[in-house]
From Swiss-Prot:
Homodimer. Its main location: cytoplasm. Keywords: Aminoacyl-tRNA synthetase, ATP-binding, Cytoplasm, Ligase, Nucleotide-binding, Protein biosynthesis. It comes from the Bacteria. This is Histidine--tRNA ligase. GO terms for biological process: histidyl-tRNA aminoacylation. Belongs to the class-II aminoacyl-tRNA synthetase family. It catalyses: tRNA(His) + L-histidine + ATP = L-histidyl-tRNA(His) + AMP + diphosphate + H(+). GO terms for molecular function: ATP binding; histidine-tRNA ligase activity. GO terms for cellular component: cytoplasm. It is found in: Cytoplasm. InterPro entries: aa-tRNA-synth_II, aa-tRNA-synth_II/BPL/LPL, Anticodon-bd, Anticodon-bd_dom_sf, His-tRNA-ligase, HisRS-like_core, HisRS/HisZ, HisRS_anticodon.
Length: 458
């Protein structure tokens, strides 16, 4: 027999695991609805012209590209083939790719459907994305993102609302977190005062790795990217900035006083914190100057969330993008959004055993199959139970009761109904409680009430 496997960085999920994952999705979805967001979906495939050049050079390398259909090799330029010109070859043999995230597809969606959309457009999306990353703990090549974005509004109240959503979702999931926020305008201001404006992408890419690789490695990378030693020395106080959120803001106002864009970013951060001070939040919200988020399209506030109890990397990221739809021809449309990493949240809940009882959606009663006469009696009963929302099954084969009870046990079905000739004659059903092994009879007209009560008591 062929040895079967799945690609590295991907996973199968059993029914039990899907119950847990749906608990996560349902929790996040319910909070999104609470704040007025509406759901959309976009294709797994996007044209490479939509995807390439928008994430930055490093992240472009992580795109999964799909070979063109048919005899695509015959259309390749022989010179590029013989000279191993991979970048040129890619354009000739691949026109489509798997989406890297849900933000660029959103920008494409907004531009294509702008005449159908009411702005501000509050959308959420729960779908898988793919990245050709090196698989490791907490890092997958296929994973689900749960995004919420507000497009068509530059109000900082949107940032405040998104932080409330973050706080509420993780509270409902019982996960303790730290919420980090920063502003790309502040980072631009820092690059400006150290005279390295043209190297802003290199600086922010390196800064974003500070938590992962440490200060020494970040400084080495900055040097390799051509940042001057003098500029790197000027960056050190920013890397090491400590104190309360307000103290950091006050300190930076003095340092960045000659940078209008830097001051603008500080004013935005300060406004967000002032509004948050009016609202009770359950988790720590920290102004972290080293938070950069590697994606090129962020222009204002940026978010990142980490779990305090499990070392697994970030479980949420996001930020404001003022120019994202510009690349598709629609200007002056600001947006801001967040993205929950559902797969890392799934791993955290597993590790901390934080899942509630998820059996409420399972089958509540299995009817044993004892033959044709019993089946004819059971089918109308099944219909009545399902009609009022009680999950019920009939075993499809007339086989040994032991086998049917084993099926109920393995599928965690709490009740088994036995209908023999006596039950049919008396219009009753014998119920076996699989949890306590007790057994009792119940009149047919009392069956629905019994299970509705059982469901409420779960």
């Amino acid at each position: 027999m062929q040895k079967l496997s799945i690609p590295k960085g991907t996973r199968d999920f059993t029914p039990c695991e899907m119950d847990k994952r749906n608990y996560i999705f349902d929790t996040i979805r319910s909070v999104f609805y609470l704040y007025g967001f509406k759901q959309i979906e976009t294709p797994a495939l996007e044209n490479l012209s939509t995807l390439l050049g928008k994430y930055g050079e490093e992240n472009d390398k992580l795109l999964f590209k799909i070979l063109n259909s048919g005899d695509f090799i015959s259309k390749v330029n022989p010179i590029d083939w013989n000279n191993h010109q991979l970048s040129k070859l890619t354009k000739q043999i691949s026109k489509k790719g798997l989406r890297y995230d849900l933000t660029l597809p959103l920008a494409r969606f907004v531009v294509m459907h702008r005449n159908e959309i009411t702005f501000p457009f509050k959308r959420f999306q729960i779908q898988p994305v793919w990245r050709s990353d090196r698989p490791q703990k907490g890092r997958y090549r296929e994973f689900v993102q749960c995004d919420a974005d507000i497009v068509g509004s530059d109000s900082l109240l949107n940032e405040v609302e998104l932080i409330q959503i973050i706080d509420e979702v993780f509270h409902r999931l019982s996960i303790s977190i730290s919420i980090k926020i920063n502003n790309r305008k502040i980072l631009n201001g820092i690059a400006e005062i150290i005279s390295e404006e043209k190297k802003i992408t290199d600086i922010t890419t390196a800064m974003d790795k500070l938590d992962k690789v440490g200060l020494t490695k970040v400084n080495e990378e900055l040097l390799q990217k051509g940042i001057s030693i003098q500029a790197i020395d000027q960056l050190q106080p920013f890397f090491l900035l400590k104190g309360s959120n307000q103290n950091k803001i006050s300190t930076l106002k003095n340092i960045l006083s000659t940078s209008p864009i830097g001051i603008k970013g500080l004013q935005e951060i300060e406004t967000i914190f002032n509004k948050l001070n009016l609202i009770p939040t359950r988790n720590t919200i920290k102004f972290d100057l080293t938070l950069a988020r590697g994606l090129n399209y962020y222009t204002g506030t940026i978010f990142e969330v980490k779990c305090l109890n499990v070392p697994i990397g970030s479980v949420l990221g996001g930020g404001r993008y003022d120019n994202l739809t510009n690349i598709f021809g629609l200007s002056n449309l600001s947006g801001v959004g967040i993205s929950f990493g559902a797969d890392r949240i799934f791993d955290i809940l597993n590790q901390l055993n934080l899942y509630p009882n998820t059996n409420a959606s399972h089958t509540q009663i299995l009817f044993v199959n004892l033959g044709e006469k019993g089946v004819d009696f059971i089918l109308p009963v099944l219909f009545s139970l399902r009609k009022v929302g009680i999950n019920a099954e009939l075993y499809p084969h007339n086989t040994k009761i032991k086998k049917q009870l084993s099926y109920a046990h393995n599928n965690q079905i709490p009740f088994v109904a036995i209908v023999g000739s006596t039950e049919i004659a008396e219009n009753k059903i014998t119920i076996k409680d699989m949890r306590s092994c007790s057994q009792f009879s119940i009149a047919l007209d009392k069956l629905i009430n019994f299970f509705q009560y059982e469901r409420q008591s779960v």
